């Protein structure tokens, strides 16, 4: 009987919220994922901002310069850059907050709740920006016959590759944010349990 009580107490101590290796590994996982989020959002922003391409059409006589393709031509792509900039800034702030809490070996329930809420908000923002950018990219690639919007990717190939790459990295950032959101909620659950 005495042996069972000791065993139960040891088990409760090792699984108590805020103790043990689970919380440490969870915090370290959050730090790593937040750094990966920073790298992904920054990469996506840089690729999108550097996507400008200018083309000249050569007809007999004189070359004609057609308008440059750049992200500022589309409100959806501007939203994409702004949303990812917000997520990039959030990743910097949340990484510092998480590292600070990790160094103190104490992560309050209020901090975990704030991280869980903000991670969920950022998932929505980045996912919506990825969808908006993806819609514009699809129109550029395939066009829309019903409203007579032509394809542009056969003309602006470099621009379309940049936009596609930025959207792919942004989709990866959305998955990282989703994982962070799940980890934040699980950490909060373990803390208040």
From Swiss-Prot:
Native organism: Arabidopsis thaliana
Similarity comment: Belongs to the Casparian strip membrane proteins (CASP) family.
Cytoplasmic side: 1-30, 98-108, 184-193
Keywords: Cell membrane, Membrane, Transmembrane, Transmembrane helix
Residue span of region Disordered: 1-24
Membrane topology value: Multi-pass membrane protein
UniProt protein name: CASP-like protein 1D1
Domain of life, per lineage: Eukaryota
């Amino acid at each position: 009987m005495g042996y069972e009580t000791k065993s139960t107490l040891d088990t409760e101590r090792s699984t108590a919220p805020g103790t043990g290796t689970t919380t440490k590994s969870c915090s370290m996982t959050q730090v790593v994922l937040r750094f990966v989020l920073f790298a992904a959002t920054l990469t996506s922003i840089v690729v999108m901002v550097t996507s400008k391409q200018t083309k000249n059409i050569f007809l007999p006589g004189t070359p004609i310069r057609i308008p440059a393709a750049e992200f500022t031509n589309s409100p959806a792509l501007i939203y994409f850059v702004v949303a990812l900039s917000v997520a990039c800034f959030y990743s910097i702030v949340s990484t510092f907050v998480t590292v600070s809490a990790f160094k103190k070996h104490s992560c309050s329930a209020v901090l975990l709740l704030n991280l869980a809420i903000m991670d969920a908000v950022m998932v929505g923002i980045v996912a919506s920006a990825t969808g908006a950018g993806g819609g514009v990219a699809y129109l550029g690639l395939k066009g829309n016959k019903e409203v007579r919007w032509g394809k542009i990717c056969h003309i602006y190939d470099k621009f379309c590759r940049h936009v596609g790459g930025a959207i792919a990295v942004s989709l990866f950032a959305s998955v990282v944010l989703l994982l962070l959101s799940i980890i934040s909620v699980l950490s909060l659950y373990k803390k208040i349990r």
